[in-house]
């Protein structure tokens, strides 16, 4: 009898081990967090855990099955799915089962786990990628979708990430705002139902809400206490975060491109890659989470993240559009006297048939205005070099004024609706970057400037309009792809610029802080937080952005805004970020100028 019992115990143990081997547990760890998946008896992938790092196998083995990791449309789930596909035969469903997974080293200290899922009825493959940066406690995730059906399938939803949490309470911190009023922090509890943060603006996508959030677990986290999950999407276009609490008080977070008006026709054999979603978990408050992002960005994501930044003097508030060569040469001398590294020439230097004397005309015609700059940009670069400083230049190459030669010659390059009156934002329209010819033109703006003036040392790349009049002459019957292909076209241009001019730093700007994502910051060394430079209000704006971005990535200038405050206070606030000046130095008192000179020297 004892022998039979022992045999039965051994048999059951072996059976359990074999079953466990058939149903893998996939562990993804950073130094202080864990994300655990397991394959269930039905062959589907489930997220069992997300939170503080689990160090013992016994803890992992006793985790519950959890919730399906990447929920599909059309099956038994009752809430928001991560993916929705329409097959060739009209079937709108997808059932994903585990196929395989692998973990590999990407670089020293960075690992990637790839989980492959497939539909058992249709030849559709979905790969979930998880890249870990252990020391910084950052996980990057994205999704790849492909198929082998005879004709293109239609993608209606295609999330970068789906995460599940099961806690008593959830508190969302969002960062909403508007022009000159960016990154306002507000907290709210999440209860049954759905909360959506999204944008449909296209080019100037983050004007009302930026692509990041904080989520406190169980109680509202403070700077140094509490559990918090912090996430951001690397996408310079329409995004959507969906937070849905279900009938069991379980929360799903779906992050990715906003699928609004963006059904995507995916041909067989082509891989649709979603943007990257980055997140970190902290058990020690929001401050630790923000420092995780700062450390990671400097080491891995931000262009020249470990390099110093150039201080500068911008001419905008001193001149606006009213300047000539003589006046600018004087300002270059002022910049040198201040001690900054660079003089930055802002808007107003280009176009001849329709000279850029205001924001109503000239945008798109990137030749120097002969009346203002008879000797071109080259003369200004020479003068800056003589003074021992660098020269930088403002451009807005993705945009066009209807009153321009570019618009007259290439209206087919412009996003605009047929048979409709045009609606303008800041008197301009957006060029169609889904069109390869337009991509060549935009790259050519930078390339021509650099070819003719190789000592130009910096670009301020602006983007002042969202997409209006939404129609692409180039895409024709594929209008649903415009919001996506337009952003991909921007990236194509930026990659070419970075490859040809790797040592030229650039500032990302969009009427203030309406562009601020980590995919764009692969190509830019810094971004402009806000056109609001009132130092009191700037403190709050900079605090909001600092939750995600390191100080060296955020530009802040000393200006005449709120001149009731002292120059010292304005300079101190600007010095919290990447320091610049945008003020008429000749209007300063002698002691104020002296203080600024000392501040620049100390900053450098």
PLM features: residue spans?
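Bacterial Sec-dependent N-terminal signal peptides
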Residues: 1-23
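Short acidic, Pro/Gly- and aromatic-enriched capping/linker segments at domain boundaries
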Residues: 21-26, 247-267, 503
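Polysaccharide-binding surfaces and accessory modules of carbohydrate-active proteins
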Residues: 22-37, 45-244, 260
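N-terminal structural segment of carbohydrate-active enzymes
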Residues: 28-39, 47-52, 66-68, 75, ...
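Short Pro-Gly-centered flexible turn/kink motifs
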Residues: 32, 92-98, 264-283
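Conserved, mostly hydrophobic/aromatic
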Residues: 32, 143, 269, 313, ...
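Aromatic-lined carbohydrate-binding/catalytic grooves of carbohydrate-active enzymes
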Residues: 304-444, 453-458, 475
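Active-site neighborhood of glycoside hydrolase catalytic domains
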Residues: 369-376, 382, 386, 407-568, ...
């Amino acid at each position: 009898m004892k022998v039979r019992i022992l045999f039965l115990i051994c048999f059951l143990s072996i059976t359990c081990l074999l079953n466990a081997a058939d149903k893998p547990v996939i562990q993804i760890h950073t130094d202080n967090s864990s994300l655990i998946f397991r394959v269930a008896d039905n062959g589907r992938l489930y997220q069992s855990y997300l939170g503080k790092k689990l160090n013992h196998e016994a803890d992992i083995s006793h985790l519950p099955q959890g919730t399906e990791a990447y929920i599909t449309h059309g099956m038994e789930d009752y809430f928001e799915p991560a993916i929705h596909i329409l097959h060739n035969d009209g079937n709108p469903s997808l059932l994903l089962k585990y196929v395989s997974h692998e973990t590999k080293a990407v670089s020293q200290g960075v690992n990637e786990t790839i989980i492959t899922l497939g539909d058992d009825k249709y030849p559709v493959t979905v790969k979930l990628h998880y890249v870990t940066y252990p020391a910084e406690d950052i996980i990057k995730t994205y999704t790849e979708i492909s198929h082998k059906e005879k004709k293109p399938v239609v993608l209606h939803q295609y999330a970068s990430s789906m995460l599940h949490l099961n806690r008593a309470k959830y508190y969302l911190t969002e960062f909403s705002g508007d022009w000159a009023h960016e990154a306002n922090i507000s907290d709210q509890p999440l209860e049954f139902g759905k909360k959506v943060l999204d944008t449909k603006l296209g080019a100037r996508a983050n004007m009302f809400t930026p692509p990041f959030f904080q989520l406190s677990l169980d109680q509202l986290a403070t700077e140094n206490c509490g559990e918090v999950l912090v996430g951001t999407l690397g996408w310079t276009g329409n995004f959507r975060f969906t937070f849905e609490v279900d009938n069991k008080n379980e929360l799903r977070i779906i992050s990715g491109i906003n699928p609004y008006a963006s059904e995507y026709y995916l041909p067989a054999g082509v891989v649709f890659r979603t943007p990257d979603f980055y997140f970190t978990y902290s058990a020690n408050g929001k401050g630790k989470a923000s420092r995780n992002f700062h450390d990671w960005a400097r080491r891995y994501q931000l262009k020249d993240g470990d390099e110093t930044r150039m201080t500068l003097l911008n001419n905008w508030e001193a001149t606006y559009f009213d300047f000539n060569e003589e006046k600018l040469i004087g300002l270059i001398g002022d910049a040198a006297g201040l001690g900054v590294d660079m003089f930055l020439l802002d808007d107003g230097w280009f176009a001849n048939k329709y000279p850029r004397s205001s924001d109503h005309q000239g945008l798109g015609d990137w030749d120097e205005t002969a009346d203002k700059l008879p000797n071109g940009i080259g003369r200004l670069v020479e003068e800056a070099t003589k003074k021992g400083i660098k020269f930088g230049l403002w451009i807005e190459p993705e945009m066009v004024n209807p009153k321009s030669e570019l618009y007259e010659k290439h209206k087919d390059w412009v996003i605009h609706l047929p048979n409709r009156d045009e609606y303008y934002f800041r008197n301009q329209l957006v060029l169609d970057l889904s069109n390869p010819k337009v991509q060549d033109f935009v790259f050519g703006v930078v390339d021509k400037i650099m070819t003719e003036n190789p000592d130009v040392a910096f670009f301020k790349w602006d983007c002042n309009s969202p997409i209006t009049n939404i129609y692409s002459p180039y895409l024709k019957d594929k209008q649903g792809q415009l919001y996506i292909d337009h952003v991909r076209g921007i990236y194509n241009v930026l990659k070419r610029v970075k490859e040809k001019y790797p040592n030229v730093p650039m500032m990302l700007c969009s009427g203030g802080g309406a562009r601020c994502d980590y995919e764009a910051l692969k190509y830019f060394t810094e971004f402009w937080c806000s056109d609001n430079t009132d130092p009191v209000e700037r403190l709050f704006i900079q605090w909001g952005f600092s939750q995600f971005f390191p100080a060296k990535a955020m530009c802040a200038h000393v200006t005449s805004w709120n001149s009731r405050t002292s120059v010292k206070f304005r300079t101190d606030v600007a010095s919290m970020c990447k320091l610049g000046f945008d003020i008429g130095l000749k209007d300063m008192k002698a002691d104020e100028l002296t203080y600024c000179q000392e501040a620049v020297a100390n900053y450098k």
